[in-house]
Each structure stands twice: as structure tokens, then as C-alpha cells.
Amino acid sequence: ILRATGTTLSLLTAERTALNFLCHLSGIATVTHEWVQRLEGTNTKVRDTRKTTPGLRRLEKQAVHAGGGTNHRHGLFDAVLIKNNHITAAGSVRAALEKTRNAGVPVEIEVRTREELDEALQNGATHLLLDNLTPAEAREWVTYIRSVKQGVTIELSGGINLQSARAYAESGADFLSSGSITHSAVAVDINFGLTME
């Protein structure tokens, strides 16, 4: 993976910290690659979330990318994600979308019911997050969305794991998002061997 040179003291001092980073980030890249392989042959891509370790978001997202996954947003500055609490606070899907009309960044909205879905589509939503559906429900919703409006980006999330990923991908969604690829990835076992020259 890597070759480092330096004094014995500096190498041994940095060893554990460096290994911790490499093990953790390699675990993320590895599990992401497993998702990518599971989705092979579909048009669906795996996407990370903002559920990252404080201070390590950039590196963890880079590890997702290295594993073949795609990055969602890095923060509140590069995309808006309207979740159920935002809809409740705004009063309706329409009102929440209206508040973000001139955001200058992509706007994605989570819809929980068919009524919210229709309201989102009627009010110009182009990026939809469908959360906590079964694979059968996901297929039904994706088919409906594609029949009503072309060009909508559809993301599925909530309760999706590596074992169920393929069934969700076969719904025709554009993305599956999973916080588990960053927050629950098992570290890869990597060691450090010192040689003296």
C-alpha cells in the first residue's frame, strides 16, 4: 500500500496513527467496492451520506470514491436535502420547495407518502429521496415516478444493506445511499514492517 522512509523514531512514533487511518479508510473503500460489485449490471450507483466521523469527512468520502462509489453532498453548502422535519417546519412539500427555489445548488426532497410525492413532482422537484421502502414498494414508486416525469433523479435510502442492495437496485433507482459504508465499515487488517538500511 505504501512505503515510508525516515528515522526509526519518527516511523515508530507515526506507526499506529498511520495504520489506524489506513485500516479505517481501506475498510470504507473495501465495503464500498463490495456494494459496487453487488450492483454490477444495473444502472444504480452506491452513494455515501454525511454520516461520517467528525474531522474525517473529506478522507472518508475520498475512500468511498476509491472504492468505486459516488459522493452525495459534503455539507450544507453544496446541496440542499429537504427532510421530513423541514417539510413539517415549512408546512408542506410545496412550501419547503419554494423556500429553496433560488438555492443555487441541487435540491433533493425526501417524500414519505404518495401525496407528498405527487406534490413534489407538481412543484418542480427533480431529485427525490425515497426512504424506508421495501424493494417491491421501491419498484412501484420508481415506475410511477418515471411514468409521470422524465429526468427525475431517484435515491433510495433507509434499511438497505449489502444483502438487499441488488433487490433495491433492480427497482431502477439512480442511487442507493447508505451511511453504513462510512460509519460501520470494518477496518482492514494492515500491518507495518520496519526494515533497517
Task: List each language-model region with its residue ranges.
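Acidic/glycine-rich phosphate/pyrophosphate-binding loops and surrounding catalytic core
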Residues: 1-123, 127, 133-144, 152-155, ...
